[in-house]
């Protein structure tokens, strides 16, 4: 099937929306966040995966942002994973139901906290004990990371004025690299340097929304 025909068929289903099979993948293209939510509402318990389409800026097409797509997925117990390419103007991201026992990343925990406050999490998902735990369990700041920040007087002064959510996200990002010592040191140094200058780090995929 040609790329032109693929996109034509995908666009023709926007109003419902319905997924199409493209090169063996179940692909979904939505113009608006509410369409993605509607699809999840009808399929989150029955489907096992979908490849969501993100148009490039150069395409001139309207699509759902990565962050909005992830938020809606979390509302229905799904998470994002592998990235792919549909064509030169359209990227793909695989969304699947979250595996039981799979840990939530700190950005996703922050998303869940906000979504819970807004009452957007599906009742069946909100009733899950793992979701409850993710939302309500206090974050533990590793003492060695705090000690490293305290060692820089100006950085520590500025650090204390940052929001709790920002500190959780950035410290968790540093901590996640512990098994890669060089990367861990790089992340910690970058955070301390930025904090000394009283600058926040802009994260991936719109995570700064949660730097409340």
Where are these regions (language model features)?
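Charge-dense, helix-prone N-terminal extensions
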Residues: 2-212
């Amino acid at each position: 099937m040609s790329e032109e025909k693929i996109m034509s068929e995908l666009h023709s289903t926007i109003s419902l929306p319905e997924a199409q099979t493209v090169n063996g993948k179940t692909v979904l293209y939505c113009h608006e966040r509410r369409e993605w939510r509607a699809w999840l509402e009808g399929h989150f318990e029955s489907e096992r995966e979908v490849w969501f389409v993100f148009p490039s800026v150069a395409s001139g097409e309207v699509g759902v942002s990565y962050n909005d797509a992830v938020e809606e997925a979390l509302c229905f117990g799904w998470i994002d994973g592998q990235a792919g390419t549909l064509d030169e103007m359209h990227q793909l991201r695989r969304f699947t139901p979250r595996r039981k026992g799979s840990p939530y990343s700190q950005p996703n925990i922050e998303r869940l906290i906000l979504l819970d406050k807004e009452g957007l999490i599906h009742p069946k998902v909100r009733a899950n004990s793992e979701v409850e735990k993710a939302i309500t369990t206090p974050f533990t700041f590793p003492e060695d990371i705090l000690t490293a920040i305290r060692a820089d007087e100006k950085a520590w002064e500025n650090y204390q004025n940052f929001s709790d959510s920002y500190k959780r996200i950035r410290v968790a990002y540093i901590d996640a690299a512990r098994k890669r010592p060089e990367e861990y040191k790089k992340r910690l140094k970058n955070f301390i340097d930025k904090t000394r200058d009283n600058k926040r780090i802009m994260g991936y995929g719109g995570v700064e929304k949660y730097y409340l």
